């Protein structure tokens, strides 16, 4: 039986992420201005001077992560037997998704806060959003392995976590902290 309540809830949070990215990075309200802002995702100062080829590579991975998340959430909404997995409790599934999506939604605002006036403290605040999302994603991966999920769910969560944990939680955080220390 498909869990429409959980699906609707996670869909709304997913839309909130998209909205926060468009609102802050697209600056559609002209509220999120700072020196050096451009209206190109590829040339955005939020990439901290990464080469275009690396940005393109990360965008491909981001798209695969979005597809992976959809694959995983479909499994979570249709699965009824998680065995002894941490995901067997609905409140755990909900908490992990809320932490992951909630802090992913807050991240663009914290990143803007950093860009307005870079400092080590602000970079750590910004990175903490990514770190909390990363921890939630790691636990989602663990629960998916524990539940002996079907291959599509496992591949989906691994695609997602490669971006959330490695590209964002480690890579982008390293660039942000480096920027705060040496710029």
What do the predicted segments below correspond to?
Residues 13-33:
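Alpha-helical transmembrane segments of multi-pass membrane proteins
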Residues 32-54:
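Perimembrane loop-to-helix junctions flanking transmembrane segments
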Residues 51-52, 116-130, 151-155, 181-183:
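Non-cytosolic membrane-interface motifs at loop->transmembrane helix junctions
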Residues 136-183:
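Terminal transmembrane helical module of multi-pass membrane proteins
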């Amino acid at each position: 039986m498909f869990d429409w309540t959980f699906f609707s809830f996670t869909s709304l949070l997913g839309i909130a992420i998209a909205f926060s990215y468009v609102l802050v990075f697209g600056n559609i309200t002209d509220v999120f201005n700072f020196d050096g802002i451009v209206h190109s995702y590829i040339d955005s100062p939020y990439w901290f001077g990464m080469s275009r080829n690396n940005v393109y590579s990360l965008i491909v991975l981001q798209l695969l992560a979005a597809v992976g998340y959809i694959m995983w959430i479909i499994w979570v909404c249709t699965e009824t037997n998680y065995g002894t997995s941490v995901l067997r409790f609905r409140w755990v599934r909900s908490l992990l998704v809320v932490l992951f999506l909630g802090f992913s939604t807050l991240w663009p605002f914290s990143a803007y806060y950093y860009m307005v006036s870079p400092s080590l403290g602000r970079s750590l605040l910004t990175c903490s959003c990514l770190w909390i999302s990363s921890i939630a994603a790691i636990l989602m991966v663990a629960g998916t392995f524990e539940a002996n999920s079907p291959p599509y769910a496992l591949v989906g969560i691994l695609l997602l976590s490669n971006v959330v944990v490695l590209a964002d939680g480690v890579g982008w955080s390293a660039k942000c902290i480096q920027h705060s220390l040496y710029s």
